[in-house]
Amino acid sequence: VPAMIQVMILEPQCPETDFSSLAYILYGGSPIAESLLRKAMKTFSCDFVQIYGLTETGNCAVCLPETAHTSSNTNLLKSAGQPFPGVSVAIVDSAGKKLPPSQIGEIWLKSPAKMLGYWKLPEATAKTLVDGWIHTGDAGYCDNEGYIYICDRLKDMICYAGENVYPAEIENILYEHPAIQEVGVIGVPDEDFGESIKAIVVLKAGMQAKALDIINFVRGKLADFKLPRSVEFVQTLPRTPSGKVQKGKLREKYWQGYQRQVN
């Protein structure tokens, strides 16, 4: 996962290590910041391949091959790739209607390797597997060439003043900040706008930054409604054993007393 790539790059011995025998790095599991991917490609000087899929789809469903990582179309570095042969992808709205290219919706996958169902969990199966389609819970879109772009987990989407904001888009920008080592963007309760955007930041050792510096770094790179409204500095971010940031744990203390983590 991207977090492991970042840990390797931050390892003090990394600049002195000979990686000439390294042929491929396969990565996936969570969105990767473009700045981190470019740094990794330069550091390891090997081929990179991204894999996207779920356990429910037989893991591998979409692939961004090594050739796409070095394509003149640099926008492909933001993509998860194209479906493997035999895999179908649909981008749908909340009513299950298929959306045209460039429109964001939920990613559905149909694969010959998809699960039959969850063991002894018929309700969960009925919710996730519908008419042969796996409902991934991921928000994304496709382009005219069939490349899939993942925005974020639907459950992590922030609704600010009626606008849908995907944290990964903001995090991708913030990872370019020279003082930021890690960042997680979440929605917190806001009486006026429903949810407000908060950036939880881990600074690099020996680096300093103020909240306004972080906010202004995003200004001009994204629409104003996507700017963080507040910043909290912490020592570490909670992660799963595989290295994914646990957004639910980041939100917990802000949503205590609320019946749901959306306002």
Regions found by a protein language model. Give the residues of each.
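AMP-binding/adenylate-forming catalytic core of the ANL superfamily
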Residues: 1, 111-117, 127, 139-226, ...
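Alpha-helix capping/helix-boundary segments
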Residues: 4-5, 32, 114
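Gly/Ser/Thr-rich phosphate-binding loop
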Residues: 9-75, 88, 95-98
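Glycine-centered tight turns that cap/initiate beta-strands
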Residues: 13, 21, 45, 86, ...
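Active-site glycine-centered loops adjacent to acidic/histidine catalytic or metal-binding residues
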Residues: 29, 53, 81, 138, ...
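Conserved ATP/PPi-binding loop(s) of AMP-dependent carboxylate-activating enzymes
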Residues: 82-86, 95-128, 163-165
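Conserved beta-loop-beta connector loops within the AMP-binding
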Residues: 88-108, 144-145, 207-211, 246
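Acidic/polar alpha-helix N-cap and adjacent early helical turns
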Residues: 252-263
